[in-house]
UniProtKB/Swiss-Prot annotation:
General function of this protein: Phosphatase that converts 3'(2')-phosphoadenosine 5'-phosphate (PAP) to AMP and adenosine 3'-phosphate 5'-phosphosulfate (PAPS) to adenosine 5'-phosphosulfate (APS). Is also able to hydrolyze inositol 1,4-bisphosphate (Ins(1,4)P2) and inositol 1,3,4-trisphosphate (Ins(1,3,4)P3), but is not active on AMP, 3'-AMP, fructose-1,6-bisphosphate, Ins(1)P, Ins(2)P and Ins(1,4,5)P3. Probably prevents the toxic accumulation of PAP, a compound which inhibits a variety of proteins, including PAPS-utilizing enzymes such as sulfotransferases, and RNA processing enzymes.
Residue numbers of Phosphoserine PTMs: S240
Tissues with expression: Highly expressed in heart, brain, spleen, lung, liver, skeletal muscle, kidney and testis.
Binding site for Mg(2+) 1: E74, D117, V119
PANTHER family to which the protein is assigned, alphabetical: 3'(2'),5'-BISPHOSPHATE NUCLEOTIDASE 1 (PTHR43028:SF5)
Record: residues binding Mg(2+) 2: D117, D120, D247
Keyword Protein biosynthesis: no
Family note: Belongs to the inositol monophosphatase superfamily.
Cofactor(s) recorded in Swiss-Prot or TrEMBL: Mg(2+)
Protein name, entry field: 3'(2'),5'-bisphosphate nucleotidase 1
Activity regulation annotation text: Inhibited by Li(+) and Ca(2+), but not by Na(+).
Residues reported to bind AMP: T195, H198, G220, K224
Length: 308
């Protein structure tokens, strides 16, 4: 039995393998051809068979190994028996070799909260925009996001039949972020990435105030943060309620681990303790570099309309 002082790295190592399994499930559901789409609250708020299966897989796999965790998932699923084939009990040996940052070495299992988005970018998943899709597992301690795993099931899917499909990015504050090549957006350019399907006047007003050279409208919070760390966008601007804690927890860690910053529109850090409301009601503002420029451009009219 591994010692309890190493609980964070054991959890990250397990979540890495679980996220890879989740990516396989996402691809299998597409390959089978029946997405099992259910409309939740609106035509843009969808749930698929993949959402349901992946959440069952992640939550059941984690809770078997770490029974004292608090796990909060996007999908509201009825309790029931979980198919044994959905359980992943492996762990990344490479991650286990990494040192646990000293500030987290004494963490207890019951102090951790895990935020799960089984399929981030579900609408895009149903429309075949597969590169927008991610699986998100975020880990929080004392209300702060400290570790995150992002699986991209369809990374490389347009690179030809010989390409390796999918990748898993992971990070821990104080250790770093891994599984991708860090790249900054072109200097002097303001390339904004924002929502594809949930725009409104607040969002467009806020983006206009940034003097953008280009605006990218894509699905998925995880996908947008990946655009920041790979130099495809300079800032992620979403001046609206809509995205939830499970959308931002894992991506925030990856961004923060490489020196970026993610806050609400007012510049407040997001809170991830288990009692917190799920909605990021004051929106999201994030950048890898030059965060202060984007924060300084947010109009007062936008700030006053978004109450934290």
């Amino acid at each position: 039995m591994a010692s309890s002082h190493n609980v964070l790295m054991r959890l990250v190592a397990s979540a890495y393998s679980i996220a890879q399994k989740a990516g396989t499930i996402v691809r299998c559901v597409i390959a089978e051809g029946d997405l099992g789409i259910v409309q939740k609250t609106s035509a843009t708020d969808l749930q698929t068979k993949a959402d349901r299966m992946v959440q069952m897989s992640i939550c059941s796999s984690l809770s078997r190994k770490f029974p004292k965790l608090t796990i909060i998932g996007e999908e509201d699923l009825p309790p029931g028996e979980v198919d044994q084939e959905l359980i992943e009990d492996g762990q990344s040996e490479e991650i286990l070799k990494q040192p646990c940052p000293s500030q987290y070495s004494a963490i207890k299992e019951e102090d951790l909260v895990v935020w799960v988005d089984p399929v981030d970018g579900t609408k895009e998943y149903t429309e075949g925009l597969l590169d927008n899709v991610t699986v998100l597992i975020g880990i929080a301690y004392e209300g702060k996001a400290i570790a995150g795993i992002i699986n991209q099931p369809y990374y490389n899917y347009q690179a030809g039949p010989d390409a390796v499909l999918g990748r898993t990015i992971w990070g821990v504050l104080g250790l770093g972020a891994f599984g991708f090549q860090l790249k900054e957006a072109p200097a002097g350019k303001h390339i904004i990435t924002t929502t594809r399907s949930h725009s409104n006047k607040l969002v467009t007003d806020c983006i206009a105030a940034m003097n953008p050279d280009n605006v990218l409208r894509v699905g998925g919070a995880g996908n947008k943060i990946i655009q920041l760390i790979e130099g495809k966008a300079s800032a992620y601007v979403f001046a609206s309620p809509g995205c939830k804690k499970w959308d931002t927890c894992a991506p925030e860690v990856i961004l923060h681990a490489v020196g970026g910053k993610l806050t609400d529109i007012h510049g407040n850090p997001l809170q991830y303790d288990k009692e917190v409301k799920h909605m990021n009601s004051a929106g999201v503002l994030a950048a890898l570099r030059n965060y202060e420029y984007y924060a300084s451009r947010v109009p007062e009219s936008v700030k006053s309309a978004l109450i934290p």
